[in-house]
Amino acid sequence: LPRLVGRAQAMGLAMLGDKIPAERAVQLGMIWQVVEDEQLQAEAKKLAEHLAQQPTYGLSLIKKAIHAAAENNLDEQLILERDLQRLAGRSSDYKEGVQAFMQKRTPEYKGC
C-alpha cells in the first residue's frame, strides 16, 4: 500500500480503517475505474469483450511485469522486461499484429 499511495496515506488508511468512497480510491490509485451500480454488468461485459480481442498472451506478460514491479529493484525489473519482450516477440500474436499493421487490417489474435 505505501508504494501505491505513499507512506502518509497508507498509514492513515491502515490505522484509521475508514471507508473510502470509490472516487477517492480512484484518486489514490487504488482502483482503476468507477461505474454506477446499474452499469456494472454492461461495463464488465464490454471490458471482457475488448480484452478478448487483444493479444491475450501479451496481456499476460504485461500483468507479470506489473505485478513483479512491486517487488523488483530497477535492475531486476529491466532484466525481466527484456526477457518478457523476447517472449512476446516470438509469439504468433506478435507476428499477426505486425502483419495486420503492414496490411492495414484489424488483427485476429489467437492468444499464443
Please place each PLM-identified region on the residue numbering.
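Crotonase-fold acyl-CoA enzyme core
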Residues: 1-59, 91, 96, 105, ...
